[in-house]
Design a protein with these regions (language model features):
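Non-catalytic cap/lid and distal C-terminal segments of serine-dependent acyl enzymes
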Residues: 1-279
Length: 279
């Protein structure tokens, strides 16, 4: 692992780092915020997954999360959204290839060698962070925005013993039923719809059995989001949650769109949501 830069931030420490990944067969980058409390004890960690076209820097520089994270004592890790590099396959479209990893393990050529973001996020990166930084592995939460909201919910549902709290802003919750998901899943996973269901929040929730004892999932969604009706469809997820007893708090926010002004407005609510479970 290489630390590229470190900055004092609200009494804590924000670092940008990279390492050679075996999961994605390329260099991967991430940012990590350590609150002041991490100098004396292991602290809970919140994994933040960003959306289409983003890198590790978008949330880090735009969300305004670190003042409250320092107060609450939350470590925040923000990885890149995909493998990158000259040898990594790409696509001219913004919603495929580099910057559009969709937090799955691709099975189709030419994507399968590098696009293994599910394994990277759930296994390799947590092991690295636990070895190098003062995280409490028994207190982990996961959150994200848009494509990252899809990643946060699906990863949280598939690994409930690891991620104790889940939240999302403007998440893609039903990729089997939206153009972004259908395009990406066709390319990365092929035409076997059963494999698609493994990365669809609605499908996973419906198959989860009784979820009545799990903490509530917080979702914020702007009602002026240009992608709301065609791509995001949060009501589909609410119905899936109701069917298995999962508490979900979907908050429709009047006038807000899909961007980081929206994220920065509500990020503190999400940090408090996770801290209530983890801290």
């Amino acid at each position: 692992m290489q630390i590229h830069s470190t900055h004092v931030c609200f009494g804590g420490q924000l670092s940008y780092a990279s390492h050679d990944s075996t999961a994605t067969s390329c260099e991967m980058r991430f940012s990590i915020f350590l609150p002041p409390q991490a100098t004396v004890e292991k602290r809970p960690v919140l994994w933040w997954l960003s959306g289409l076209t983003c890198t590790e820097d978008n949330f880090t520089s735009k969300a305004g999360a670190y003042r409250l994270a320092a107060e609450l004592g939350l470590i925040i890790v923000a990885p890149d959204t995909s493998p990158r590099g000259d040898k990594v396959p790409d696509d001219e479209a913004y919603d495929m290839g580099q910057g559009a990893g969709f937090y799955l393990d691709a099975t189709q050529s030419p994507w399968s060698k590098h696009f293994r973001m599910y394994s990277y996020i759930t296994a390799e990166l947590p092991a690295l962070i636990a070895a190098e930084f003062p995280v409490n592995p028994d207190a982990q939460g996961i959150a994200g925005h848009s494509m990252g909201g899809h990643g946060a919910i699906t990863i949280g549902l598939k690994n409930p013993e690891m991620y104790k709290s889940v939240s999302a802003l403007s998440p893609i919750v039903n990729p089997l039923d939206c153009p972004w998901g259908q395009k990406a899943f066709s390319a990365y996973l092929g035409e076997d719809k059963a494999s698609w269901a493994e990365y669809d929040a609605c499908e996973l929730m419906q198959a989860a059995g009784d979820r009545s004892t799990y903490p509530a999932i917080l979702i914020d969604q702007g009602d002026a989001d240009a992608f709301l009706e065609e791509q995001l469809k949060p009501q589909n997820f609410v119905k899936a949650c109701e069917a298995v007893g999962q508490q979900v708090n979907l908050r429709m926010q009047p006038g807000y769109d899909h961007g980081f002004f929206f994220v920065s407005t509500f990020i503190e609510d999400h940090l408090r949501h996770h801290a209530a479970v983890l801290c």
